[in-house]
C-alpha cells in the first residue's frame, strides 16, 4: 500500500509519523525543467557547406542569426532554464540541467528525463551520457547513506510502430498489452523487471536494452532510432533501524529516449522506414498536443493521453505525480532551421506545464495495523476525557456570565416594578376620600424623592426663606405633584418594560448560542464514535487479509572485355528483335483475357445440384492429387524435377508439395479434360443409336413423347458443353497467367542486359580498352574480388533476411545458399534473387492475408498461403528424418538443437527449428546442411547453377488447354 506524504529529510525520518488512511497529503507544485542543447555541425553538414543558424548568447537564451530571419513574425529569441552550446559536454548538461531531478528518486519522488528533438540531433548520444552519470550518482549516494537499505529494479521497453516490446525479454517477440491499475495507473502486462545486484550489473542490463532497440539507416542518420525507448529504475529504500514511523521510500526514475521527428523529403524514407516514420510522427504529435493543453492550464478540458501508447505510459510524468526534465536537442544547420524552431516552440510550451510531485512512502501491513490501533486509542481517550479549554469554551463561559448578569438585572427590575405598583395602588386608595389640596406630606415626599423632581434640601431652603409663604408653597407643590405623578410613573413603567424586553431578547439569544454549542459537542462525539468504529473495522479487515507478493551500397564491377561486350551486344540485338514479338504476345494475352471474360459472362449461372456433383468430385479428386508429395527415397528422376528453379515467388514450396506439378500436370489436365470432353461427345453419338434401335423415328417426330426426349437431350448437351467450357476457362486462365509471368521476366532480362551493355559502351567511350588495362588487370581483379566478396556477404545477408520475412521455401533457401559461394559469376543470380525478394516483400505487404478465390487466380501469393506452404514443407521434411538420418545422428541433432528427448513429435519440433534465425550465420549454415541431407542434395552430382536460370525461356511442357473443342479455339483465335 502506497501512502503519499510531504517530503521529509532523511535525518528526521524516524520522527516522522505515518499518514493516516484517508488523510490528505500535501503536494509540491513544480514546473517542468526544460534545457536546450545545441550540437556542433556534423560531417554531412560540413561537407554540404551549410551555414550556422542558431547561437547561444548566454546560459539561458538561444537566438537565431539575422540572416535566417526570413519572416518578421517568427520568434527569434528563446529563454529556458538552461542552454548549452556546441562546446558543452554531456557532463555539464547532466550536472546543471537534470541532476536534481534524477536524484529526487532517492527521496521517494518520481522523476522522468526526456530527450526530444528531430532526427540526427543528438538525443541518443545525450541520453547515454545522462544515464551513465545518473547511475554513478545513485550508487555514490547509496555508499554515503549506510543507514538505509536500497533496492533497485530495472525494466526496459520500446514502442515500435505503436507496439510495446520488452527489451529485456526479446525472445518473446510479441507485443505487450497496457492495463489500467486503480493504484498504479497504466501498467505493462508481463513486463520483465530485473533486480540490479550492483552498479556494473545495472550498466550491463542497460546495455542489453540499448542493443535490442530498433535502429535503421536513413539519408540523415546511419543509425537512426526507429522506436521510443523507456528505461525505468524502481528505487526503494528502507531504514535499517526498527521504528514505528513510516520508513520506506519508493519512486521510479524514467529515462525516455524519444525517436526523432523526420520529414520524408529529407530522410528519403520509403517502405518500412516510411511506415516507421509515420508512427513516430503520430506519437510525437500526440505528445505535443498533451503538452500544449497542459500548458494552457485548463485541466477541466479533455487531454488525449490515450491517443498514443507513449503518452499513456508516461501520463504521471505529464502533469502528474512526478518531477520532469526535458532535454531538447537542436541541429545548428540552416537546412534544419524549421525543425529546430518547432522544437523550440515545443520547449516553450513544456516549460509552462506544472506537475504535482509528492513523496511516495510504503507501509507494511503490520505497521499499518499498529498505527491504526494507536489512532483508535487516542480518539477513545479524547472521547472519555475532554481536553483543555479552547477558545470556544472560553467564549461559552463569557456568554454564560453575561446571561447570569442579565438575569439578575431583570429580576431587580421586576422587583422595583412590583414595589412601584403596590405604592401606586395604596396612594390611589388614600386619595379617594381626601382633598388633593390637603393631602399629607409624606406620600408626596416619597413620590418626589423617587421621581427626583424636588429634593428635601430644596424644600428646607424654601421654608427658611419664606416661612410665611410655606403653606401657599406647599399647597402649590401639592397641586403640581398631584397632577404630574401619574404621568411620571407611567413613563418609568414603560422604560422598565422596554428594558425587560431587551434583557429577555439577549437572554434568549444567549440560550440559543449555548444550545448550538452543546449540539456541536454532541455531533463531535458522534463523529468521533463513527471514526472509531470505522478504524476498528479497518483493523479487523487488515488482520484477516494476508500480505500479497510482483542497405548497403553494392558496387557492380564488370571487367571490360571485348568478347563479353560482343556477346552482350549480340544478346541485346536479339532482344530488340524480339521486342515486337513480346509486344504482340502481350496484345494476344490481352485479347485472350477479354475473350475469357466474355466466355465466363456467357455461361449460364443456374446449375442444378445434381449437375454440380460430378464437377465437385472431379475437382476434389484433382486437389487430392495436388497434395501428394513428389519425393520418395527411390525416386531419382523426380528429384531432378524437384530441384528445378522456381519461376514465381514461393514456387519452390509448390514444387515440393504439388505432385510433379511441372512435369505431369499437363498430362493430368489433358486426361481430366479428355474425360470431361468424352462425355458429351459420347452422349451425342449414343442418342441417334438409341433412336435407330427403337424403330420408326420419322413416324414419331410429331408426337409429344418425341418432343420431350429431344428437349431432355438438348439440356444434357447444354450441361455437358458448360462443364467442358468451364474446364477450358480454368486452363486458359492458368496458361495466360504463366505467359504474363514469362513476358515480365523477358522484359527484366532485357533491361538488365541493356544496363550492362550501356555501362560497357560508356567505359569504351571514356577511353578504356583491354590493351590499356592489361598492365593493371591483375590489380583490378584483386580489388574486384575483395569488393565483390564484401558485396556478396552483404547481399546474401539481405537475401536471408528477406527469405525469413517472406516465408520462402526452406528447400529453395538451401539450394541457393549451398550453390552460390561468392564467385564473380554469381553476381547476376544474387541481384535477381534480391530484386525478386524485394518485389515479393512489397507484394505481400499489399496483399496481406487475403486468400485468392478458387479457380480464379491460383498464382496470387498471400502471407497466409506462404506460411501454409512452408508449414506443409516442414511436415514433409519431418517425415524424411527417419529415412535420411541414423538413430545416432538423430539423437545427436536433437541434443544439439535443444529438442526434448521425451517429447512428442520430436521430428517436427526439430525441423521447425531450422532456418528460424536469419541473423546467425552458423545457424543458417547448419540448417542448410541438414535440409540438404534430408532432401538428398548431397547425393545428386549433377546439380549446377544453371538450375537457377530464372526460367527466362518458355518451358516446353506448357499446358495443353485446348482439348478438342474447335468452336472455343476459333473464338479465342489461338
From Swiss-Prot:
Gene3D superfamilies: Kinesin motor domain. Phosphorylated at Thr-145, Thr-687 and Thr-703 by CDKAs and CDKBs. Phosphorylated NACK1 fails to mediate cytokinesis. SUPFAM superfamilies: P-loop containing nucleoside triphosphate hydrolases. Pfam families: DUF3490 (PF11995), Kinesin (PF00225). This is Kinesin-like protein KIN-7A. CDD domains: KISc_CENP_E. InterPro entries: Kinesin-like_fam, Kinesin_motor_CS, Kinesin_motor_dom, Kinesin_motor_dom_sf, NACK_C, P-loop_NTPase. Keywords: ATP-binding, Cell cycle, Cell division, Coiled coil, Cytoplasm, Cytoskeleton, Microtubule, Motor protein, Nucleotide-binding, Phosphoprotein. It comes from Arabidopsis thaliana.
Amino acid at each position: 500500500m502506497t501512502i503519499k506524504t510531504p517530503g521529509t529529510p532523511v535525518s528526521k525520518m524516524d520522527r516522522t509519523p505515518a499518514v493516516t488512511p484517508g488523510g490528505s497529503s500535501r503536494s509540491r507544485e513544480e514546473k517542468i525543467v526544460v534545457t536546450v542543447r545545441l550540437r556542433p555541425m556534423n560531417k554531412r553538414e560540413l561537407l554540404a557547406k551549410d551555414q550556422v543558424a542558431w547561437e547561444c548568447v548566454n546560459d539561458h537564451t538561444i537566438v537565431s542569426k539575422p540572416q535566417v530571419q526570413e519572416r518578421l513574425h517568427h520568434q527569434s529569441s528563446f529563454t529556458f532554464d538552461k542552454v548549452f552550446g556546441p562546446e558543452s559536454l554531456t557532463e555539464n548538461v547532466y550536472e546543471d540541467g537534470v541532476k536534481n531531478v534524477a536524484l529526487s528518486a532517492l527521496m521517494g519522488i518520481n522523476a522522468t528525463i526526456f530527450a526530444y528533438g528531430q532526427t540526427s540531433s543528438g538525443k541518443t548520444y545525450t541520453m547515454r551520457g545522462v544515464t551513465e552519470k545518473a547511475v554513478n550518482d545513485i550508487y555514490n549516494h547509496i555508499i554515503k547513506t549506510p543507514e538505509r537499505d536500497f533496492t533497485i529494479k530495472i525494466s526496459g521497453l520500446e514502442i515500435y510502430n505503436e507496439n510495446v516490446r520488452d527489451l529485456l525479454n526479446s525472445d518473446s517477440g510479441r507485443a505487450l498489452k497496457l492495463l489500467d491499475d486503480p493504484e498504479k495507473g497504466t501498467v505493462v502486462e508481463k513486463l520483465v523487471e530485473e533486480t540490479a545486484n550492483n552498479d556494473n550489473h545495472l550498466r550491463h542490463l542497460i546495455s542489453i536494452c540499448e542493443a535490442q532497440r530498433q535502429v535503421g539507416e536513413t539519408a540523415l542518420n546511419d543509425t537512426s532510432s526507429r522506436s521510443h525507448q523507456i528505461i525505468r529504475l524502481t528505487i526503494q529504500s528502507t531504514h535499517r533501524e526498527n521504528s514505528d514511523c513510516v520508513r520506506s521510500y519508493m519512486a521510479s526514475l524514467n529515462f525516455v529516449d524519444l525517436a526523432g521527428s523526420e520529414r520524408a523529403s529529407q530522410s528519403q524514407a520509403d517502405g518500412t522506414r516510411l511506415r516507421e516514420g509515420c508512427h513516430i510522427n503520430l506519437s510525437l504529435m500526440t505528445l505535443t498536443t498533451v503538452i500544449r493543453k497542459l500548458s494552457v492550464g485548463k485541466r477541466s478540458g479533455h487531454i488525449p493521453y490515450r491517443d498514443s501508447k507513449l503518452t499513456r505510459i508516461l501520463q504521471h510524468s505529464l502533469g502528474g505525480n512526478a518531477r520532469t526534465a526535458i532535454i531538447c536537442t537542436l541541429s545548428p544547420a540552416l537546412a534544419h532551421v524549421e525543425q529546430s524552431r518547432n522544437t523550440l516552440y515545443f520547449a516553450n510550451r513544456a516549460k509552462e506545464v506544472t506537475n504535482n510531485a509528492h513523496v511516495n512512502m510504503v507501509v507494511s501491513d503490520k505497521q499499518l495495523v499498529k498505527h491504526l490501533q494507536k489512532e483508535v486509542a487516542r480518539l477513545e481517550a479524547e472521547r472519555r476525557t475532554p481536553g483543555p479549554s479552547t477558545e470556544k469554551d472560553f467564549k461559552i463561559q463569557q456568554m454564560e456570565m453575561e446571561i447570569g448578569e442579565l438575569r439578575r438585572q431583570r429580576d431587580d427590575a421586576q422587583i422595583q416594578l412590583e414595589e412601584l405598583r403596590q405604592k401606586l395602588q395604596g396612594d390611589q386608595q388614600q386619595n379617594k376620600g381626601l382633598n388633593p389640596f390637603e393631602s399629607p406630606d409624606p406620600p408626596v415626599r416619597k413620590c418626589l424623592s423617587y421621581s427626583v423632581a424636588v429634593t428635601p434640601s430644596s424644600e428646607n431652603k424654601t421654608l427658611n426663606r419664606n416661612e410665611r409663604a410655606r403653606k401657599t408653597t406647599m399647597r402649590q407643590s401639592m397641586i403640581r405633584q398631584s397632577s404630574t405623578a401619574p404621568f411620571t410613573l407611567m413613563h418609568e413603567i414603560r422604560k422598565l418594560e422596554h428594558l425587560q424586553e431587551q434583557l429577555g431578547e439577549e437572554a434568549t439569544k444567549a440560550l440559543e448560542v449555548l444550545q448550538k454549542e452543546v449540539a456541536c459537542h454532541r455531533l463531535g462525539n458522534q463523529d468521533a464514535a463513527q471514526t472509531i468504529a470505522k478504524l476498528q473495522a479497518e483493523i479487523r479487515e487488515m488482520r484477516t487479509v494476508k500480505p500479497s507478493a510482483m542497405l548497403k551500397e553494392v558496387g557492380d564491377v564488370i571487367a571490360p572485355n571485348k568478347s563479353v561486350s560482343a556477346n552482350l551486344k549480340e544478346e541485346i540485338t536479339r532482344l530488340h528483335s524480339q521486342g515486337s514479338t513480346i509486344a504482340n504476345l502481350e496484345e494476344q494475352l490481352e485479347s485472350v483475357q477479354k475473350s475469357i471474360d466474355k466466355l465466363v459472362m456467357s455461361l449460364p449461372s443456374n446449375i442444378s445440384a445434381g449437375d454440380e456433383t460430378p464437377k465437385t468430385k472431379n475437382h476434389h479428386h484433382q486437389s487430392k492429387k495436388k497434395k501428394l508429395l513428389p519425393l520418395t527415397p527411390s525416386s531419382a528422376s523426380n528429384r531432378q524435377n524437384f530441384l528445378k528453379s522456381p519461376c514465381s515467388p514461393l514456387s519452390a514450396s509448390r514444387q515440393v508439395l504439388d505432385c510433379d506439378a511441372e512435369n505431369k500436370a499437363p498430362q493430368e489436365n489433358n486426361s481430366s479434360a479428355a474425360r470431361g470432353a468424352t462425355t458429351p461427345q459420347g452422349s451425342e453419338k449414343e442418342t441417334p443409336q438409341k433412336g435407330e434401335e427403337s424403330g420408326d423415328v420419322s413416324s414419331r417426330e410429331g408426337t409429344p413423347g418425341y418432343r420431350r426426349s429431344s428437349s431432355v437431350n438438348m439440356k444434357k448437351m447444354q450441361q455437358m458443353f458448360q462443364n467442358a467450357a468451364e474446364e477450358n476457362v480454368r486452363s486458359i486462365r492458368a496458361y495466360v497467367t504463366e505467359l504474363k509471368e514469362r513476358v515480365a521476366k523477358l522484359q527484366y532480362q532485357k533491361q538488365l542486359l541493356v544496363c550492362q551493355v550501356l555501362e560497357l559502351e560508356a567505359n569504351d567511350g571514356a577511353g578504356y580498352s583491354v590493351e590499356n588495362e592489361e598492365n593493371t588487370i591483375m590489380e583490378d581483379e584483386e580489388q574486384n574480388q575483395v569488393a565483390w566478396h564484401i558485396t556478396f556477404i552483404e547481399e546474401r545477408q539481405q537475401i536471408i533476411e528477406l527469405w525469413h520475412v517472406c516465408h520462402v521455401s526452406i528447400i529453395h533457401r538451401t539450394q541457393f545458399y549451398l550453390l552460390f559461394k561468392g564467385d564473380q559469376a554469381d553476381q547476376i543470380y544474387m541481384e535477381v534473387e534480391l530484386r525478386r525478394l524485394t518485389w515479393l516483400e512489397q507484394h505481400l505487404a499489399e496483399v496481406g492475408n487475403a486468400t485468392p478465390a478458387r479457380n480464379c487466380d491460383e498464382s496470387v501469393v498471400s502471407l497466409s498461403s506462404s506460411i501454409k506452404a512452408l508449414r506443409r514443407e516442414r511436415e514433409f521434411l519431418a517425415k524424411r528424418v527417419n529415412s535420411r538420418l541414423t538413430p545416432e545422428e538423430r539423437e545427436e541433432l536433437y541434443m544439439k538443437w535443444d529438442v526434448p528427448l521425451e517429447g512428442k513429435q520430436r521430428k517436427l519440433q526439430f525441423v521447425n527449428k531450422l532456418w528460424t534465425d536469419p541473423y546467425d550465420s552458423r545457424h543458417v549454415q547448419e540448417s542448410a546442411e541438414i535440409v540438404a541431407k534430408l532432401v538428398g542434395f548431397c547425393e545428386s552430382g549433377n546439380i549446377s547453377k544453371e538450375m537457377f536460370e530464372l526460367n527466362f525461356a518458355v518451358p516446353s511442357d506448357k499446358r495443353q488447354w485446348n482439348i478438342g473443342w474447335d468452336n472455343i479455339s476459333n473464338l479465342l483465335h489461338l
